[in-house]
């Protein structure tokens, strides 16, 4: 599982772009609307959901843990 360091809280759509899973905001929106994204094992349909450190985001076989930066 990857660990991606971001400033928390971060929106789900922005996290998908930072992680390289979505190439654009529109692509992130499409992934979320299609139900392809999970947060902590549960399907998530809100692109603007705020993620916190420790949350696990999944798309298909890919999973990553949200890690908070110190600054």
Show which residues each predicted segment covers:
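A basic, amphipathic helix-loop patch mediating RNA/tRNA/ribosome contacts
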Residues: 10-53
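A detector for short, charged/polar N-terminal pre-domain segments
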Residues: 1-8
